[in-house]
């Protein structure tokens, strides 16, 4: 056998070994990728280029959160307005992260008492700190109809509406109770409190009253 033929055979054996090694390696890699790209149920996992899985997950989270909100807050929201008010609460949270619906209700009841007592004492300074200056004159017209504050335990409050107009937040609360004040036996009024979402000041002001 000539040296050339022997040399060709050697190259052929080397080439066969290299090709076989490549096929084995590539085959193994492909198989591993198939295993990686299968779920526990064995179906292939498709890359989610639209991020719909993430969106769906967030949607589920939002729905769960909303359901929890409705369960937690239903006792402090007027029954017919639950969905609209929960929407409003979510809207406020986007602007005021520290907003606490339950705490706000309790503080509003305290503000109600402070306003009525200040009105009865004709404390203009305190009223000016609690009432929007654009509404103060209108409020002064109805002061005589309240008399003095009588019983805080009889006063209840529920959210009836929440909305934004520009950067201003408006929260309307339904105050109810019997003999809460001297001159109104059966109190049923909607008080609107407002504040600017962009200001650093955290004060809310009474901006309107409707008797229902």
Curated annotation (Swiss-Prot):
InterPro entries, sorted: NTF2-like_dom_sf (IPR032710), Tim44-like_dom (IPR007379)
Signal peptide range in chain numbering: none
Origin superkingdom: Bacteria
Pfam families: Tim44
SMART domains: Tim44
SUPFAM superfamilies hit by this protein: NTF2-like (SSF54427)
Name of the protein in question: Uncharacterized protein RP434
Source organism: Rickettsia prowazekii (strain Madrid E)
Lineage of the species this protein comes from: Bacteria, Pseudomonadati, Pseudomonadota, Alphaproteobacteria, Rickettsiales
């Amino acid at each position: 056998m000539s040296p050339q033929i022997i040399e060709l055979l050697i190259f052929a054996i080397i080439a066969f070994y290299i090709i076989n090694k490549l096929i084995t390696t590539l085959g193994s890699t492909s198989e591993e990728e198939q295993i990686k790209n299968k779920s526990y149920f064995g179906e292939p996992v498709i890359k989610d280029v639209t991020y719909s899985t993430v969106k769906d997950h967030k949607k589920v989270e939002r729905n769960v959160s909303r359901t929890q909100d409705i369960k937690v807050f239903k006792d402090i929201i007027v029954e017919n307005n639950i969905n609209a008010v929960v929407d409003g609460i979510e809207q406020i949270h986007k602007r005021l992260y520290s907003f606490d619906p339950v705490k706000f209700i309790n503080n509003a009841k305290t503000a109600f008492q402070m306003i009525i007592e200040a009105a009865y004492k004709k404390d203009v300074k305190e009223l000016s700190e609690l009432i929007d200056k654009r509404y103060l004159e209108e409020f002064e017209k109805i002061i005589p109809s309240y008399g003095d504050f009588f019983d805080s335990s009889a006063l209840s409050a529920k959210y009836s509406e929440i909305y934004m107009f520009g950067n201003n937040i408006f929260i309307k609360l339904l105050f109810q109770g019997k003999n809460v004040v001297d001159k109104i036996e059966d109190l049923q009024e909607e008080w609107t409190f407002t504040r600017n979402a962009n200001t650093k000041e955290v004060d809310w002001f009474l901006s309107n009253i409707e008797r229902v």
